[in-house]
Amino acid sequence: MTATIIDGKETAKEKREQLAKEVEELKQKGVTPGLAVILIGDDPASLSYVRGKKKAAEAMGMHFQLDHLDASLTEEELLQLIDQYNANDQFHGILVQLPLPKHISEKAVIERISPEKDVDGFHPLNIGKMLLGEDTFLPCTPAGIVELLNKTGVNLSGKEVVVVGRSNIVGKPVGQLLLNENATVTYCHSRTANISEHTLKADILVVAVGRANFIKADQIKEGAIVIDVGVNRLDTGKLVGDVDFEEAKEKASYITPVPGGVGPMTITMLAHNTVKSAKRTLA
């Protein structure tokens, strides 16, 4: 068996075309969806992510504002800037690019963003609503993963899902979203005694650990759907995921590539949340 590639670029393109139409409809009603992004310091990966967000948002017709600030910025100055955006009706989404300098509390920043403008889906109120299965802003990468799984046409209900990784940004929330879809979810992490024992039972395997080629074919059930969230750069400069793609694609039924799998969906779902927030202002 050679796996069918789940094309994140194509799925993201379709979704972005739909969002562009929705943005145009909102503009005709006098509302231009606005996204404010705050970037502190000069982390190369963060700069690259922010450029991608700007390009995507503007291509969909959204208003995009970037505040690129020096790493010496104090926590209080950042919180005051967030307050300004919270109070500004032109902006429907506020995103503070992580990671932050060590002297700034990530928790304080996330909790300062208004839950109504928390398009990253990280605010405790929105996390709580997600746990309860209520309508809210879902974290972008997990929501993108669910979209990709839905594209396969596979019914998630009753499926054995194994999530390798338990970060607050991907691992924990993606498991919860799949639980909300009536899947049976197991989490594996650095303290899990025998990861293979769990991964070999997975109908759907989601890997988000940030370790190049961590999962090999002998840890994957025949015919499983494999979602690879990792993006790792080898010494050769090549980008690879957390799953050994060349091996795994001979065992899985569906697999996401790296790059071009989950990544394009993350920015797309950020735009989706921003448009959703803008629509709420008309309700």
UniProtKB/Swiss-Prot annotation:
For biological process, the GO terms are: L-histidine biosynthetic process; methionine biosynthetic process; purine nucleotide biosynthetic process; tetrahydrofolate interconversion
Q: Which domain of life is it from?
A: Bacteria
Its keywords, alphabetically, are: Amino-acid biosynthesis, Histidine biosynthesis, Hydrolase, Methionine biosynthesis, Multifunctional enzyme, NADP, One-carbon metabolism, Oxidoreductase, Purine biosynthesis
Q: In which pathway does it act?
A: One-carbon metabolism; tetrahydrofolate interconversion
Record-level Gene Ontology MF annotations: methenyltetrahydrofolate cyclohydrolase activity; methylenetetrahydrofolate dehydrogenase (NADP+) activity
Q: Which InterPro entries match?
A: Aminoacid_DH-like_N_sf, NAD(P)-bd_dom_sf, THF_DH/CycHdrlase, THF_DH/CycHdrlase_cat_dom, THF_DH/CycHdrlase_CS, THF_DH/CycHdrlase_NAD-bd_dom
What does the function comment of this entry state? Catalyzes the oxidation of 5,10-methylenetetrahydrofolate to 5,10-methenyltetrahydrofolate and then the hydrolysis of 5,10-methenyltetrahydrofolate to 10-formyltetrahydrofolate.
Q: Which PANTHER family does this entry report, sorted A to Z?
A: C-1-TETRAHYDROFOLATE SYNTHASE, CYTOPLASMIC, C-1-TETRAHYDROFOLATE SYNTHASE, CYTOPLASMIC-RELATED
- The name under which this protein is listed is Bifunctional protein FolD
The upper taxonomy is: Bacteria, Bacillati, Bacillota, Bacilli, Bacillales
